[in-house]
Design a protein with these regions (language model features):
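Thiamine diphosphate
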Residues: 1-167, 171, 306-307, ...
């Protein structure tokens, strides 16, 4: 099987869907002439032209509204944010229009739109460019939220997101665009709302998603040296969440650690903790451990940033804590 970069998987997913459906178009800052800020739309302007690959002014509120309005006339837009930190400017359109059009119109209108771009930290980008918003959007009924961790999942899930008749938040990472992975040549999709067991184990369940899951794999390798077997679940979709796969894993391992790159208050890990303790409490042999960023804005200093972010050492400590070792 061929190996391609994450950015190439994103580009392939968009291009393949645009070839099969003329109602799909891409818009955002620098997506056309510059081939995308992270080259995720490389070559698409040449293939599809300026009417379907559209450079926008620096006005996230404006082009989000244009795209959402166009869904009501039969279009299926893909909106790229240079970073989801900038999506805050367009949040009124996403939360108050995209997420609510179907219900408020009594089902007369649907809103098939994908908002995609990088989320969370990416090195020394400081406080306003290092925030994770998946839990914010997942809190909103009407939105689906996807956070893939590798090229294969990214392509399959993005194709499903583009075909979905409801608004989808599709979150990537600047630090993943160069990641390589095996992706088949043929057509495939991955259903939204289905998590994946990336590594099977018997002693503890680790749940994570997005780029931070790499720290879980590093920790699992380290723990294996001590004879500790970790099962790693990649959520892939934050909303709708695949609770059942987590419950079944906890029934087997009896211990749960959740790793997430977000502030500790009211996040995805908190929701998982509630669901497991409500529906699988009798299978737990230890309190659930959750690992998040520090409860402060992201620092610029590389020394402080290293301490702010969760890492594999944090995961090792959490696993040993739930194992009472």
């Amino acid at each position: 099987m061929r190996t391609i970069q994450f950015r190439e998987a994103i580009c392939e997913a968009m291009s393949e869907e645009m070839r099969s459906d003329d109602s799909i178009y891409l818009m955002g800052e620098e997506v056309a002439e510059y081939n995308g800020a992270y080259k995720a739309s490389k070559g698409m302007l040449d293939e599809f032209g300026p009417e379907r690959v559209i450079d926008t002014p620096i006005s996230e509120l404006g082009f989000a509204g244009i795209a959402i309005g166009s869904t009501m006339t039969g279009n299926r837009p893909i909106v790229e944010y240079m970073t989801f930190n900038f999506s805050l400017v367009g949040t009124d359109q996403i939360i108050n229009n995209a997420a609510k059009i179907r219900q408020m119109s009594g089902g007369q209108f649907k809103c098939p739109i994908v908002f995609r771009g990088p989320t969370a930290s990416a090195g020394q980008l400081a406080a306003t460019h290092s925030q994770a918003f998946e839990n914010w959007f997942a809190n909103t009924p009407g939105l689906k939220v996807i956070v893939p961790s590798n090229p294969y999942d990214a392509k399959g899930l993005l194709k499903s997101a583009i075909r979905d008749d409801d608004p989808v938040i599709f979150m990537e990472s600047e630090q993943m665009y160069g990641d390589k992975g095996e992706v088949p040549d043929g057509e495939y999709t991955i259903p939204i709302g289905v998590a994946d067991i990336k590594r099977e184990g018997d002693d503890v369940t680790i749940v994570s998603f997005g780029k931070i899951i790499k720290e879980a794999f590093l920790a699992a390798d380290k723990l294996a040296e001590d004879g500790i077997s970790c099962e790693i679940i990649d959520l892939r979709t934050v909303r709708p969440m695949d609770h059942q796969i987590i419950f079944e894993s906890v029934k087997k391992t009896n211990r749960l650690v959740i790793l997430e790159e977000a502030w500790p208050f009211g996040n995805v890990a908190t929701e998982i903790t509630y669901q497991v303790q409500s529906r699988a409490f009798d299978y737990l042999d230890a309190p659930i451990e959750k690992i998040n960023t520090a409860d402060t804005p992201a620092p610029y200093s590389p020394v402080l940033l290293k301490e702010w972010l969760p890492n594999s050492e944090d995961v090792v400590k959490a696993v040993k804590k739930v194992l009472y070792k």
